[in-house]
Structures are given as structure tokens and as C-alpha cells.
Amino acid sequence: ITHVSADGADWISVVVAERIPDAILCADAFHVVQWATAALDQVRIQAWRDARAAARSEPKRGRGAPRKDAPPRPASTLARGIQRSRYALWKNPEDLTDRQHAKLAWIAKTDPRLHRAYLLKEGLRTIFQLPYDDAVEALDLWLGWARRCRIPAFTKLARSVKKFRDVILNAIA
């Protein structure tokens, strides 16, 4: 056994070092992207909660269907749109449908923070598709971007990725 692919659990590195000391530990690309997807989902849920709170502060309508001349409720529309954006944010860009592309374009216009979180997730995902030398540079650039992004879920993710940087790069090599 020359390589061991695993997630970032600390106990795995201890067992591998103990049982197979010459093996190279590699971070499974799926799990690293899963960390980014979980961080993105935290940002999406917080954006939805913020939009829902704004929607609750809008004036209430009466019973029944709204009148044709009723004022629009933009915060309610925003909350509903963010709530229904989960799959568009999770999928790989090459697998998106036309409606999901439109949803991402809408997110880019209405919630820049959520869109930035999506771009961070996709940036980390693309690192695994690069040649090793390019991946080293791209990972360092991504770490800098994630540390400075002012999105708590991604600054926390940046600390985890930095901790497992060598293991992640072993998977690319």
C-alpha cells in the first residue's frame, strides 16, 4: 500500500502512521469539497434567515389572495428564492440546468455574499482538477481569499484546509 485516501479525521492519520508508516496519506477530494459545500450551506441558511426576518417586517396582507393593486413584497420573494437555491448552489457548474444557471445569476444580483461563498466552493473544487504545480499556487491563493472573505464559515474552512494542506496536495500529486 503506497497511498491512503481518506477524509480529514484525525484518528485516520494516527492509524495510518501506526499501521502503514510508509504510506502517503491523501485527502479525498470528495470530502474536501463536501467541507466547502457544508460551509456554503451555512451561508445560504443564514442568508435565508436574514431575508425571512426582513420579510416578516413587511406589512401584513389581509386574508385571501392579494389584490391586483397590492404592493409587492420584495423581501418575501428574496427569502423564497434563497430557500429554493440549494441544488443550484450544490451542483457542479457543468451539470446545471438552464433554470439553475438563471438562479445563480439571480443570486449574484441579489445576494453578493452568498454568490461569493459559491465562488469559493467552486474555486476549491477546481483545484483538484489542476496539475500539481498549478494546484499548489491555486490552493495558496484560495487560502488567502478564504481567510480575507469575511464569511465566518469560510474563514473556519480556510483554517481546516490550511491544517490539511499537505494531505490535500498529496491527493493531487
Model region roles, listed by residue range:
Residues 2-21, 30-33, 53-173:
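Acidic/histidine-rich catalytic cores and adjacent linkers
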